[in-house]
Amino acid sequence: MIRGSLREQGEGGSLGFWFAAGVLTLFLPSCVAPDRDHHIVISTRDQKLALVEKGIVIGTYPVSTSKFGLGDGQGTYRTPLGEMEVAQKIGDDAPLGAVFKDRRRTGEVLVPNAPGRDPIVTRIIWLRGLEAQNSNAFARDIYIHGTPEERNIGKPASYGCIRMRSQDVIQLYNIVGRGARVTIVDQPLADVALVPKPRVFR
C-alpha cells in the first residue's frame, strides 16, 4: 500500500525517499508487536482446542490431530507436544473452502466433506516450536488449518497438523496474532489450568 500511494504522487521523489519507503514496506510486518493476549491450548486426548484471552477461556473448538500419534521426528506425520507459537498466518480473506498447496491458493474451492479430497483449506496458522521436543515443527509445516474432511473432526485423522472446521479456523484466525502462545498437551483440558468454564462455539 505504501508503494501504491507513492506511485500516485508521481515519479519526482528523491532516491532517499524511495529507498526509505521500500525498507519500510519490507520490514513493517515484522515490527508488529507479538500477540501476548491469546493462548491456544490443544488437547490430543480430548481432540479439542481452547482459546484463552488474557487468562479467560473464551471458547473451545473440536479438532483433529495426527492419526499416527505424537512426536516431532521428520517424516513421522505425528503431532508434536509442548510449547509453540504462531509463526505465520496465511489466507487473509480467502473464501471458505479455498484450497492451498505449498501455502498458496490454487484457485479451487471445496465444500465441506467433498468426496475423495483432503487438501489444506480456508486458513493456515503455521506453528514454530519453542522446545527441543518440538523443534522441527516449523520445518515440518505443522499448521492449524481448515479441512474439507469435517466429518473426521473430533478424532485423530491428520498427518501431524491440527485440523479444524473451516468456520472455526476462520474465527480463530481472526482473533489470534503472530507470536500467540500455543500449547499442545496429551491430557484432558479439564486437567490443564485454564480457569473459568469455556463457552462452546459448537
Regions found by a protein language model. Give the residues of each.
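N-terminal secretory signal peptides that target proteins for export/translocation
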Residues: 1-12
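Sec-dependent signal peptide recognition
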Residues: 14-21
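C-terminal motif of bacterial Sec signal peptides marking the signal peptidase cleavage site
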Residues: 29-30
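Exported/periplasmic cell-wall-interacting domains
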Residues: 35, 73-77, 94-202
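Post-signal peptide N-terminal segment of mature Sec-exported envelope proteins
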Residues: 37-59
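Well-ordered beta-strand positions in beta-sheet-rich domains
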Residues: 39, 60-62, 83, 141, ...
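Structural motif
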Residues: 46-48, 83, 124
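Electropositive
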Residues: 62-94
